[in-house]
């Protein structure tokens, strides 16, 4: 018998076999810039929060429901039934998320604090150059403001009504806080006032749910809340227990103002200004019923106020209208009695949009303002970008505006770059200020220059808000970092583990804007990434990058398509035994039966082989099976549809896309907006969840290999679409498919204000059509907080181990499929991670991968995490019971220098031999090609291994064999 090597080309047709190809990146892929302006991002994210979090009936998150979940989280303790997951922070350490609060310690200017709206409180001891998490328990408290009293105490406010939808309904997005807490050092904190201090019992009160701004004068604290301005002085014990509302409709009116107080500012002499709707109230001292100066700002909906630090008579306001566009900016020289307008809305200047006079405004979302400490007539205003104003004339006061930052192009090569969306500004001195943005913390140290420059200060400020997660089977050999990727809110799609990156925990932004669903191919070095409104691209290590639509989708998505959240899912395999594709090979030698023909797949030139069963002559053209297969599903490019391509991983041709689901699907028409999708391990089924509660199964994908058999508009289409569940209009936020049995799936739901969030199904591939939940069993029990569950994963080694990503972190069970529904026992699994929202969880289920069994989590506020707690000797040894020991012979055992392996395989394929130490670490690996069905023999050198016990795992096609090995030297 001979081995022969030939080059092949793809032909649509028949059968395939495999050889392993590594995921290799020679250099970072090309960056794909943001496609649309930040205004679409801000409005879109609030739509997404509402879809996932708000109650499906009321359209709001009732604070009482939020607090019920939070109170349960605060009382929970680790259960003895928990899996004991230990989470490791992965970064990215160079990407900051939305930041609305920064404080410089007045007693130590190098000590700083910064607050993320979903990632918690961070501190720095070196002026912002390096950050650390203060306490992970505070990760999901929507930190909105920080202040410091004269005696040095530091207080943090939570919840922000700027985290709203365009209609101004903060409750719809779930950006609820818990009042005010004091940080007391060493990670400790004490709740001072609000639901955090006194948990309500299903109260409908929303007092202290949103603290928009804290200001201190002396030791008095002013709090701008959703129920008005609140003021408190410390008692003799230093407690802030007596809060009062000092503002009345007028000084002669007994009715207090209890509407949303957007901002408060205190002058150097104690004068106080507070902003409500379209009004500014001013008091000489902040005492009860002293806010007698009332100024109305025409057309205003949101107002910020700021006194000049060097002159208490000078007060500025910046106001936006109900559309988020500039209403006006004014300056007062008499403590708010009168104002001169220094910027009028409706003109060519509007810091809250990139297109003045054309809309696209977002002042309802991003507004910031600060006066230079040493110059009362020099002002910074932040919207999408930063602007500076300085006075050029008096009586009336007027001045000049200058844009001093640029949100694009981004990166260190642009000295004026500051991430889009400005939320907070604080001066350190007359020339230095810090900025809180959608991209974390920035600083300028030359603000008096004509053209100030800026730097990012996000090292270890790991507050990126991820929506999605893509994992690979590759670990960078240079730095040991797993190659993963994820889509973020306003920080694009970030890739970790690439070579030539400055720090192993740094991310590389492969595309800008808001990144959503993403995936990494196993059979090629291709990354798939998305942006809002149906923007889908792929990138390869060769530097190739771009969209890959056919003519139909190019037309549909020319100006954007689909909803804000772009939903995709990718599947591939090295070995699809029933493949219908083939490679055409021209022989350059005679071939006899039993000869091995080596050739290449049409995907990534992956080496394949075929054992000849008949004779061929030199020059013959034959078709050999292409076992390497891939599928990419793309949801919603046209409303109520799902498309699929089988050439996504092949850069050599423009992929063809087929409509695999839509109104013409049978037996059930597909409808709704898909928000999650999962393939079965064999790629034969695609499970789809929609925003209105439907779960669909699209089946027979294995036999759909061209447009005639795949496209539902074809009379020859072989696909079926079955709605197997309907969950009362709630968002299907995630689906998990058992990697060992696609009949087992878990469906999880969003939306506060409900009781049940997790369901299982044990006949998912055959479940009949249903307009209810009859195919599912509810497995939510009392131990699981009543909050949105965003994703689930079924452990590859034990279907009973189900891991959930929720609005309050990770939970898991160990009896998910064997226990009666109500007895499924959930327990918190947050060690190393905290209470941060987890939007996606994925496990590496490829048994040969170096990260096999590792679970990854994409958090919405703390970046990526991973755990190998379920990987190790227990899981490896457990596999021994899953195979016939007689199928694997290992000798000699104990061994010294060489081991011989004999297996009984059920197919022609290659084998991968892995040796693990007793810690579960992979210490040696080898692959053996050209193995025939039946008895196969291999030898492997082990003389470099230290004496001790090991586990040998052999992966042969779909079979896995495991044996213990003892090395004795």
Where in the sequence are the language-model features?
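Serine/proline-rich low-complexity intrinsically disordered segments, especially terminal tails, linkers
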Residues: 11, 126, 285, 334, ...
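Sequence-pattern detector for short linear motifs
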Residues: 10, 101, 156, 966-967
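Beta-propeller blade termini and top-face loops
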Residues: 23-870
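Low-complexity, intrinsically disordered/propeptide-like segments
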Residues: 17, 23, 217, 232, ...
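Surface-exposed loop/turn and secondary-structure junction residues enriched for glycine/proline
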Residues: 98, 464, 469, 513, ...
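Bacterial Sec-dependent N-terminal signal peptides
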Residues: 1-32, 124, 873, 880-885, ...
């Amino acid at each position: 018998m001979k081995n022969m090597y030939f080059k092949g080309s793809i032909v649509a047709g028949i059968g395939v076999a495999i050889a392993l190809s590594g995921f290799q990146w020679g250099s970072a892929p090309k960056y794909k810039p943001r496609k649309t302006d930040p205004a679409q991002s801000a409005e879109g994210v609030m739509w997404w929060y509402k879809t996932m979090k708000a109650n499906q009936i009321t359209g709001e998150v009732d604070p009482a429901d939020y607090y019920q979940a939070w109170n349960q989280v605060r009382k929970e303790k680790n259960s003895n039934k928990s899996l004991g997951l230990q989470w490791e922070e992965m970064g990215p350490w160079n990407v900051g998320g939305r930041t609305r609060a920064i404080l410089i310690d007045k007693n130590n200017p190098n000590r700083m604090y910064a607050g993320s709206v979903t990632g918690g409180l961070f501190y720095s001891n070196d002026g912002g150059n390096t950050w650390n998490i203060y306490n992970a328990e505070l990760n999901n408290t929507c930190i909105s403001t920080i202040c410091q009293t004269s005696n040095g105490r530091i207080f943090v406010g939570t919840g922000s009504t700027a985290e709203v939808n365009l209609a101004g309904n903060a409750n719809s997005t779930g950006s609820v806080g818990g009042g005010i807490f004091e940080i007391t050092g060493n990670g400790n904190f004490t709740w001072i006032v609000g639901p955090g201090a006194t948990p309500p019992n299903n109260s409908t009160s929303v007092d202290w749910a949103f603290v928009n701004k804290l200001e201190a004068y002396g030791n008095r604290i002013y709090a701008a809340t959703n129920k008005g301005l609140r003021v408190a002085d410390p008692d003799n014990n230093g407690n802030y227990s007596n809060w009062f509302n000092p503002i009345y409709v007028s000084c002669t009116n007994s009715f207090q103002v209890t509407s949303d107080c957007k901002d408060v500012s205190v002058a150097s002499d104690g004068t106080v200004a507070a902003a409500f709707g379209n009004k500014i109230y001013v008091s000489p001292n902040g005492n009860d019923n002293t806010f007698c100066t009332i100024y109305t700002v025409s057309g205003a909906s949101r107002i910020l106020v700021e006194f000049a630090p060097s002159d208490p008579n000078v007060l500025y306001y910046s106001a936006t209208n109900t559309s988020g566009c500039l209403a006006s900016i004014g300056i007062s020289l008499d403590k708010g009695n009168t104002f001169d307008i220094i910027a009028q809305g409706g003109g060519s200047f509007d810091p809250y949009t990139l297109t003045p006079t054309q809309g696209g405004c977002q002042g309802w979302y991003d507004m910031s303002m600060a006066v230079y400490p040493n110059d009362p007539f020099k002002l910074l205003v932040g919207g999408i970008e930063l602007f500076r104003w300085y006075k050029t004339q008096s009586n009336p006061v007027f001045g000049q505006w200058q844009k001093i930052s640029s949100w694009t192009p981004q990166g260190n090569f642009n000295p004026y770059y500051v991430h889009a969306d400005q939320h907070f500004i604080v001066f350190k001195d007359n020339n230095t200020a810090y900025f809180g943005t959608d991209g974390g913390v920035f600083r300028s140290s030359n603000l008096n220059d004509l053209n100030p420059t800026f730097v990012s200060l996000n090292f270890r400020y790991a507050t990126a808000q991820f929506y999605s997660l893509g994992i690979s089977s590759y670990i960078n050999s240079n730095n040991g970092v797993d190659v993963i990727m994820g889509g973020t809110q306003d920080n694009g799609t970030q890739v970790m583990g690439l070579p030539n990156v400055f720090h192993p925990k740094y991310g590389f932004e492969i595309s800008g804007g808001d990144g959503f669903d993403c995936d990494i191919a196993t059979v090629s070095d291709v990354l798939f990434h998305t942006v809002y409104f149906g923007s889908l691209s792929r990138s390869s290590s060769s530097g190739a990058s771009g969209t890959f639509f056919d003519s139909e989708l190019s037309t549909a998505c020319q100006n954007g398509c689909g909803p804000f959240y772009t939903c995709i899912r990718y599947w591939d395999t090295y070995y699809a035994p029933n493949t219908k594709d083939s490679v055409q090979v021209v022989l350059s030698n005679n071939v006899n039966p039993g000869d091995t023909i080596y050739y290449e797949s049409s995907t990534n030139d992956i080496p394949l082989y075929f054992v000849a069963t008949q004779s061929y002559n030199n020059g013959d053209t034959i078709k050999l099976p292409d076992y390497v297969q891939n599928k990419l599903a793309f949801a919603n490019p046209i409303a109520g549809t799902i498309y699929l391509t089988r050439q996504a991983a092949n850069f050599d041709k423009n992929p063809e896309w087929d409509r695999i689901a839509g109104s013409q699907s049978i037996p059930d028409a597909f409808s709704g907006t898909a928000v999650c999708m999962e393939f079965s391990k064999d790629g034969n089924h695609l499970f789809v969840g929609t925003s209105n509660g439907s779960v669909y199964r699209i089946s027979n994908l294995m036999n759909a290999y061209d447009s005639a058999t795949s496209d539902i508009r074809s009379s020859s289409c072989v696909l079926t679409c079955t709605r197997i569940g309907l969950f009362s209009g709630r968002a299907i936020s995630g689906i998990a498919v058992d990697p060992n049995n696609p009949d087992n799936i878990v469906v999880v739901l969003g939306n506060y204000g409900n009781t049940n969030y997790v369901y299982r199904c044990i006949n998912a591939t055959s479940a009949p059509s249903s307009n209810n939940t009859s195919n599912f069993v509810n497995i939510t029990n009392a131990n699981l907080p009543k909050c949105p569950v965003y994703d689930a994963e079924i452990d590859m080694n034990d279907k009973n181990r189900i891991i959930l990503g929720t609005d309050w972190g990770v939970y898991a069970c160990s009896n998910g499929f064997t226990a009666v529904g109500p007895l499924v026992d959930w327990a918190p699994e947050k060690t190393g991670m905290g209470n941060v929202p987890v939007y996606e969880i994925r496990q590496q289920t490829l048994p040969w991968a170096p990260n096999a069994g590792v679970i990854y989590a994409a958090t919405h506020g703390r970046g990526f995490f991973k755990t190998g707690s379920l990987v190790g000797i227990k899981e490896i040894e457990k596999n021994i019971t899953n195979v016939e020991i007689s199928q694997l012979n290992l000798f000699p055992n104990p061994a010294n220098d060489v081991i011989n392996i004999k297996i009984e395989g059920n197919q022609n394929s290659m084998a991968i031999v892995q040796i693990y130490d007793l810690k579960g670490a992979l210490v040696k690996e080898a692959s053996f090609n050209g193995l025939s069905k039946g008895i196969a023999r291999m030898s492997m050198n082990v003389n470099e291994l230290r004496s001790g016990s090991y586990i040998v795992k052999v992966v042969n096609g779909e079979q896995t064999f495991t044996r213990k090995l003892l090395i004795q030297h």
